[in-house]
Design a protein with these regions (language model features):
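Alpha-helical scaffold segments
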Residues: 1-242
Length: 242
């Protein structure tokens, strides 16, 4: 994800891009954005831009400062606290942002999830980073969890981790069970078979796709009810004899 392109300004520049001074009071949004496209911009210049209250009214400028490879860490972290929810999402997805800054943006976003609207959570579930989508798999609203399963950044490992959580909601288990892509993965099926919320009919179907040598281990660690386990064990024995 990249910051919106801004056409270069025709007005005279108020900056000395590689000098020791910067008249940040005269900096306009277009000039600042043009300057921040320079990958070799000095950290001191970026910090001066970040101290201009007029410039910081522009979300594009804030995002450009945070995403610049030479922005001092303390400047980026301070600006993160000023961002709106979906701007935090954008920072977490910026390929040019430092890893620790992206993680800080994710942390800030995750901390806000309980206070954002259902509509915002639905949008975040599909569009956010994999780490945020993982948290939204555990949302109390089934629609949010279902939407998170469509996130292109969500991985098999994150889904298995969510399913293995003792507090995994029934609606998450059911959504994964019926998801065309994820329910076909063998490791995900194994995780589903360890959940007490998997429907017995699907448990029987999925167990047949699991290699015989690992079925017993899955049943031993499964949280399924005792009668369901017994039924699957009998099915397993029957399959082995057959």
């Amino acid at each position: 994800m990249t910051i919106d392109e801004i056409p270069p300004t025709d007005s005279p520049s108020s900056f000395e891009t590689h000098g020791d001074t910067l008249d940040s009071e005269l900096a306009g949004e277009d000039q600042a954005l043009s300057l921040l496209k320079q990958t070799d911009l000095r950290a001191q210049t970026i910090e001066e831009l970040s101290k201009n209250p007029a410039l910081l009214k522009s979300r594009k400028v804030k995002l450009a400062i945070i995403g610049h490879p030479r922005t001092p860490r303390h400047v980026s972290l301070a600006l993160l606290r000023q961002l709106f929810t979906f701007d935090l999402m954008q920072v977490a997805l910026l390929p040019v942002a430092a890893g620790d800054i992206k993680k800080a943006a994710e942390d800030a976003l995750i901390n806000r999830l309980e206070s954002v609207t259902l509509g915002e959570r639905l949008s975040l579930a599909r569009r956010s980073s994999g780490r945020v989508a993982f948290v939204l798999l555990c949302d109390k609203e089934s629609r949010v969890a279902t939407e998170a399963l469509e996130n292109p950044r969500l991985t098999e490992g994150l889904i298995i981790r969510a399913l293995n959580d003792d507090d995994a909601a029934p609606h998450l288990v059911h959504a994964v069970c019926h998801h065309l892509k994820w329910s076909a993965r063998r490791e995900i099926r194994a995780a589903l078979l360890r959940s007490e919320h998997i429907p017995l009919s699907l448990a029987v179907e999925f167990m047949r796709e699991i290699p015989t040598e690992v079925r017993d281990e899955i049943l031993r660690s499964s949280r399924l009810a005792a009668d369901a386990k017994a039924y699957l064990q009998n099915e397993n024995l029957s399959a082995s004899r057959g």
